């Protein structure tokens, strides 16, 4: 298999195939509409197949996918991304993301180099129109809430409705309860997150950008799911995202720092 080198220019994407489920016992979402047309991706946007590398980062890859982090402002999207990409924690004063930003990381998934181009979106309402344009070609979405902020959890349903309207029907979606290291400030029970995820048929885990708990697991699970969707041979056993998340995340202490 020939390998590409991470381009800095925009391009197309590798298709995925799954459906965002409606709630089983909760309010049923409308059937997803075709994603609305938006502006062209910026020069450093998602890599397109068949495009030559125009600049070197030294990261060769076999297949690339676009992943978006979404959720209310302040839930820790940027910190989660920095923890995954750089293995560091952004301590100190909180600064909201303005507009949208992205970083690349190449993972070795079952012998294949998988590049995730991860887009960090602003959660504030005034940036929503910008964010909507980026849903259309996203292969996966990580939807975050803050376990110390009840409003961010209550707003998950509104985010799901927005995703249903603007994202592709086959997008991979995972729910994350972030800041699990803040045990003393917790106001959203783990059971509440599990219940909501079950209603919508979503894989779920709690994460901590501060300690790194389940951060790599979340992105690795997404990469495995997307990789198999794009390359699965008829004889290859199906990768089960829900089972993988439950198995790999089980027994991990949320207080381990």
Curated annotation (Swiss-Prot):
It comes from the Eukaryota. One of its GO terms (cellular component) is Golgi apparatus. It is an enzyme of class 3 (hydrolase). Its cofactor is Mg(2+). GTP binds at residues 73-79, 96-97, 123, 178-179, 181, 209-210. Keywords: Cytoplasmic vesicle, Golgi apparatus, GTP-binding, Hydrolase, Lipoprotein, Magnesium, Membrane, Metal-binding, Nucleotide-binding, Prenylation, Protein transport, Transport. Regulated by guanine nucleotide exchange factors (GEFs) which promote the exchange of bound GDP for free GTP. Regulated by GTPase activating proteins (GAPs) which increase the GTP hydrolysis activity. Inhibited by GDP dissociation inhibitors (GDIs). A lipid is attached at residues 254-255 (S-geranylgeranyl cysteine). The small GTPases Rab are key regulators of intracellular membrane trafficking, from the formation of transport vesicles to their fusion with membranes. Rabs cycle between an inactive GDP-bound form and an active GTP-bound form that is able to recruit to membranes different set of downstream effectors directly responsible for vesicle formation, movement, tethering and fusion. RAB26 mediates transport of ADRA2A and ADRA2B from the Golgi to the cell membrane. Plays a role in the maturation of zymogenic granules and in pepsinogen secretion in the stomach. This is Ras-related protein Rab-26.
């Amino acid at each position: 298999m020939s390998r590409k080198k991470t381009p800095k220019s925009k391009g197309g994407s590798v298709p995925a195939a799954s459906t965002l489920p409606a709630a089983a016992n909760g309010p049923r979402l409308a059937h997803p509409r075709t994603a609305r047309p938006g502006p062209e991706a910026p020069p450093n946007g998602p890599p397109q197949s068949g495009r030559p590398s125009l600049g070197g980062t030294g990261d060769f890859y076999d297949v690339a996918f676009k992943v978006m982090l979404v959720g209310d402002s302040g839930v820790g999207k940027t910190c989660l991304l920095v923890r995954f990409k750089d293995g560091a924690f952004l301590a100190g004063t909180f600064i909201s993301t303005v507009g949208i930003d992205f970083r690349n990381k190449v993972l070795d998934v079952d012998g294949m180099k998988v590049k995730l181009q991860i887009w960090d979106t602003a959660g504030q309402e005034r940036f929503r129109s910008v964010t909507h344009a980026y849903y259309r070609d996203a292969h996966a979405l990580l939807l975050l809430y803050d376990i110390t902020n009840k409003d961010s959890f209550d707003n998950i349903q509104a985010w799901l409705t927005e995703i249903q309207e603007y994202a592709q029907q086959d997008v991979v979606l995972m729910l994350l309860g972030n800041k699990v290291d803040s045990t003393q400030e917790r106001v959203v029970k783990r059971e509440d997150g599990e219940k909501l995820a079950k209603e919508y048929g979503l894989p779920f885990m709690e994460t901590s950008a501060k300690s790194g708990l389940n951060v790599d697991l979340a992105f690795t699970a997404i990469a495995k799911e997307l990789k198999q969707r794009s390359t699965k041979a008829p004889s290859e056993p199906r990768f089960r995202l829900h089972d993988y998340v439950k198995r790999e995340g089980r027994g991990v202490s949320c207080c381990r720092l």
